[in-house]
Amino acid sequence: MAGNTFMYARNLHKIYRKNAISTPVLKGVDMEVAEGEFLSVVGASGSGKSTLMHLLGSLDKPDAGEIYYREKRIDNLSADKRDHLRNHDFGFIFQFYHLLPELTALENVMIPLMIRSSVFSWLGNGSVARKRAITLMEKVGLGHRMHHLPKELSGGEMQRTAIARALIGNPALLFADEPTGNLDEDTGREIVQLLRELNEIDNVTIIMVTHNLEIARGTHRIIKLVAGHVEVPLQLQPEAFGIVRPESFDNLPEDENHPDETRRQAGI
């Protein structure tokens, strides 16, 4: 059940520069997400969907504008504080799974907790982290695959592992950037159903970037970006937290090739 405003952004601008060429991507974006909400961000290629997610998730900084999380401004934090925020409050899922090939699925899930711990802390609490990782692997339906290497897993199983890894730190806010973009249609539906369950049962707030309107229509609300602007304005009204079906969401392309292709994991 969606609640009070959890994160909001005001007048966000982002420009990518390469040599003498400047490419404005976001041009004054305002948006909000409520606590417990499952929000979709859709738009055409180059509209700024992934850029917006990177800014909200403190993976990048805006050129102008402000971002607030739990009523505290976060876009102007130091690099160390942003790292801490990503590793303790946020979880990230991307189109590509970014699993370390030499580690088992279970070991991949444990990585964020290893990174946030000191050596001595890990020696004392590693078994607790392992138990939580096992619980999450079972939660995403991979209890029987946790000791397999990534190369032994299907695409859907690798994405489920990535979701478990994103949840290991018990994040309050989960960012999902095209989580079904590398999967077949049926597997993609399964992944989105898993995200819905996490939202509804565990009350995880989710911001999802997707080009798939069928998927987007199954979330609480939809924001459409057009040429760096929000075309469908956001209104945080209690009655708006059902499925939204805007009439203007037509003829979107199949994929987005964003100027910034970097896919960094929080704290990794």
Identify the meaning behind each predicted range.
Residues 258-268:
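Non-catalytic connector elements of ABC transporters
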Residues 229-260:
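Conserved beta-strand-loop-alpha-helix hinge in the C-terminal portion
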